[in-house]
């Protein structure tokens, strides 16, 4: 595995984690939990 592909995988994982964190911290889901 190359360094570039490894770096891209880590970046994608961090971006996905950030998107989920932003999604689950929205007031809509806090006030109306599923």
UniProtKB/Swiss-Prot annotation:
Recorded superkingdom: Eukaryota
Protein name, as recorded: Egg-releasing peptide
